[in-house]
């Protein structure tokens, strides 16, 4: 039997899930398969993405986040999941 989905009201400020909202600033690798001069290669920089969502877990190896969820009587289903190696994380800020 398919699960019924509920919409979560954007005006509902309740904290009905036991996960903190966070903003994670991190570094990521980039790659480019095109030809480049040494000057162009020297200008190459790492990507600096920012992710906002709920902190699912964090340990020495990785940080796990999710940006959407569905909660009903059967529990929580997580969506938009991201797993980042902990050494790549530069800053974690708790959001209110």
Region annotations inferred by a language model:
Residues 2-96:
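Conserved RNA-binding domains used in RNP assembly and mRNA/RNA metabolism
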């Amino acid at each position: 039997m398919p699960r019924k989905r509920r919409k979560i009201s954007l005006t509902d400020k309740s904290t009905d899930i036991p996960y903190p909202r966070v903003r994670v600033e991190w570094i990521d690798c980039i790659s480019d398969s095109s030809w480049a001069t040494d000057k162009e290669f020297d200008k190459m920089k790492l990507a600096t993405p920012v992710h906002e969502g709920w902190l699912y877990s964090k340990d020495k190896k990785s940080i796990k986040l999710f940006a959407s969820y569905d909660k009903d009587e059967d529990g929580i289903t997580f969506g938009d999941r991201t797993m980042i190696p902990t050494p790549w994380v530069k800053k974690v800020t708790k959001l209110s």
